[in-house]
């Protein structure tokens, strides 16, 4: 990650040269320590306009999001995923406005409850997936089963986050936070992602039934 840190230093020197860039924040995998050589740099800058720029800096792709305070505040209230922009960020410079947004994000995250309609939509999708998986297993169609697993794993993860009353994070962060989910299926991550086709299918079916019907032996911690 040394290349990323050198590129970050180059970028922040340029951004800090302008007083208009009042807050500068590092987001993404570099911020929460899960970056690899192919990871981008993702920065948020609070200023007086909304814009975006992307460039390669010392061989590292960098994306910089420029936003007004009001734009970010509105997004926090309209897009639950936006809270993660603040929960796992690293502040480089702040005039106080970013701190206000971060505090609001923490409050929204702690009070978040998945809307009933959202849960119903997820379960409608997953119930259909369950029937398709069962049909593929009955006919021993491994190719069809594997296809269903690959195209529906993300929806299962959405369901697990929703059942735990957490906004669904961006995909890279979602993987990083899987251990924070209360899921009463032993070694479910390994079985769902690394098992044989049969093991993956069995695990997905168990998770779907847990998500959509919350079977009596399963409970979710509240709070």
Q: Residue locations for each model-derived region?
A:
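Metal-dependent nucleotidyltransferase catalytic core
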Residues: 1-38, 44-90
């Amino acid at each position: 990650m040394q290349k990323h840190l050198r590129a970050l230093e180059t970028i922040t020197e340029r951004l800090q040269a302008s007083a208009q860039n009042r807050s500068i924040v590092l987001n993404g995998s570099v911020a929460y320590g899960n970056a690899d050589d192919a990871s981008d740099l993702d920065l948020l800058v609070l200023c007086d306009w909304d814009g975006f720029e992307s460039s390669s800096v010392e061989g590292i792709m960098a994306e910089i999001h420029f936003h007004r305070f009001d734009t970010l505040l509105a997004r926090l209230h309209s897009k639950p995923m936006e809270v993660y922009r603040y929960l796992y960020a690293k502040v480089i410079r702040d005039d106080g406005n970013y701190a206000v947004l971060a505090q609001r994000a923490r409050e929204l995250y702690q009070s978040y409850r998945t809307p009933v309609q959202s849960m119903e939509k997820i379960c409608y999708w997953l119930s259909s997936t369950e029937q398709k998986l069962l049909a593929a297993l009955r006919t021993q169609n491994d190719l069809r089963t594997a296809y269903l697993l690959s195209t529906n794993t993300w929806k299962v993860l959405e369901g697990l986050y929703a059942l735990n009353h957490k906004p669904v994070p961006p995909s890279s962060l979602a993987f990083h936070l899987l251990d924070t989910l209360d899921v009463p299926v032993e070694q479910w991550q390994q079985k769902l992602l690394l098992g044989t086709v049969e093991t993956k299918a069995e695990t997905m079916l168990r998770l779907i039934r847990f998500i959509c019907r919350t079977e009596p032996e399963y409970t979710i911690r509240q709070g």
